[in-house]
Amino acid sequence: MNKEERAKRQSKIRNFSIIAHIDHGKSTLADRILEKTNALTQREMKAQLLDSMDLERERGITIKLNAVQLTYKAKDGEEYILHLIDTPGHVDFTYEVSRSLAACEGAILVVDAAQGIEAQTLANVYLALDNDLEILPVINKIDLPSADPERVRQEVEDVIGLDASEAVLASAKAGIGIEEILEQIVEKVPAPDGDPEEPLQCMIFDSLYDPYRGVIAYIRVVNGTVKVGDKVRMMATGKEFEVTEVGVFTPKTTQRDELTVGDVGFLAASIKNVGDTRVGDTITHAKRPAAEPLPGYRKLNPMVFCGLYPIDTARYNDLREALEKLQLNDSALEFEPETSQALGFGFRCGFLGLLHMEIIQERIEREFKIDLITTAPSVIYKVYLTNGEEIVVDNPSNMPDPQSIDRVEEPYVKASIMVPNDYVGAVMEICQGKRGTFIDMQYLDETRVTLTYEIPLSEIVYDFFDQLKSNTKGYASFDYELIGYQVSKLVKMDILLNGEQVDALSFIVHRDSAYDRGKVIVEKLKELIPRQQFEVPIQAAIGNKIVARSTIKAMRKNVLAKCYGGDISRKRKLLEKQKEGKKRMKSVGSVEVPQEAFMAVLRMDDDK
């Protein structure tokens, strides 16, 4: 391609993504756009085409981002190349969104005509504005009986401050308004500005592992041109590779000779090691490197930690491989080996949030067929010791001795909750129960309110989201951001079975609710742990002080069954003998703890 052809082609490229709250119809809209641009034959078309993971289709959410190249013949007779980068909408996957937005020039904002704007819509819009994207509002699901497009249009203007006078009214399901959306993309989204002659700069916004071709990086070319056979360098790791293939997704992978400015596609270079391609890294030429890497990507820190252990301990190495493969295109997942007396060898994993944790767990169980035990999730605490030292604790069993602790700080988040008027009381009650501090309350319109609270992250980790949804009949939407650490009265609670501490059941709790929590968990474990041949005491302890206790009664055989009437001393002898046996058993016996017992530690808030 010569210089003029490249420039002409570049002016016809439009890179955009679709942002929306969960269930506002983003994946369906993506399907319609693919259909309209004839990217697929009718036979290949299936609902939620870009949600390629089974788990995504089942839960009806988008987890991984996907990129696809489309050609569209606009009304002005010209052919345009559209790159659609699909994004997730759930709060845990904001980082997936920030990655795909960094690769675009425009974003379609989908808002449900019945529901209006929700918390995560706002969060994603602010991300898009941070990346200086052109935002095109689309009001979707106008064919619903409860749709009120005019109210929603007003809401977009009032709450977000976007001009919604030209917002497209659409129904992705019925295929209404799709052409107008495509025309607006062509008209309003700017073409990529980059120079194909400059040193190469490509941003990696995702990657996946192919056992035959090695790591395949999903890239957006910002400056320069990359061809097969080029020697390229990863700017974060400094590793160099030779490009073996480049191409685009139409949604199938299609090989090309080169990728140039504005292209969104893939690059393979026989990269064998997962750690060599970091998502968010910049690829440049080895011989003529760019002066600096591209901005627009931040390292994500996990917020929630838990232990993952294989039920069959022989599969420890398989679990390591599974985690490494998942980490490849999920840069926010972190893990390190750990051991537990109760569970053997496993990994301490860091996640962005609870949904992220559940999904990684399910993917390991499905894709790698490994049965897992998970321990209670915890957050990172900062512990200041009396000798002035500061230590970071992400695992309750690493908590130092209470006597040596000066103070403990825990992470707090700022939670914005959007909720209909009728449920404000219920939401406030939940937040106060979770040690939340009320900050602000704003009315969006006559029917909806945004509440802002500061809440300890450890309280959100358990079941805040479930409680919020069930107490507001599913109407509340919720978004949170970390704001820093604050001092709290926290203590570590240990659970003792038969006098022995089970390290995997330890958790960190606020002193005020320690007694209640200990009581609930001891009762719950009593139901879940099967009866043994001997009596098993279950105790909850803080340091050396026992705060709650319950006992699992022993199973016993009726040793008197063969005595008919007769002598009491004979009966007494048999009972004494049984008692002696139980005593001996108790001193050597160990108690098996079922998986449900570990989960009980998580779910104990339900009964309170």
UniProtKB/Swiss-Prot annotation:
It is a peripheral membrane protein. It comes from the Bacteria. It catalyses: GTP + H2O = GDP + phosphate + H(+). InterPro entries: EF-4, EFG_III/V, EFG_V-like, EFTu-like_2, G_TR_CS, LepA_C_sf, LepA_CTD, LepA_IV. It is found in: Cell membrane. Its main location: membrane. One of its GO terms (biological process) is positive regulation of translation. SMART domains: EFG_C. Required for accurate and efficient protein synthesis under certain stress conditions. May act as a fidelity factor of the translation reaction, by catalyzing a one-codon backward translocation of tRNAs on improperly translocated ribosomes. Back-translocation proceeds from a post-translocation (POST) complex to a pre-translocation (PRE) complex, thus giving elongation factor G a second chance to translocate the tRNAs correctly. Binds to ribosomes in a GTP-dependent manner. Belongs to the TRAFAC class translation factor GTPase superfamily. Classic translation factor GTPase family. LepA subfamily. This is Elongation factor 4. The lineage of its organism: Bacteria, Bacillati, Bacillota, Bacilli, Bacillales.
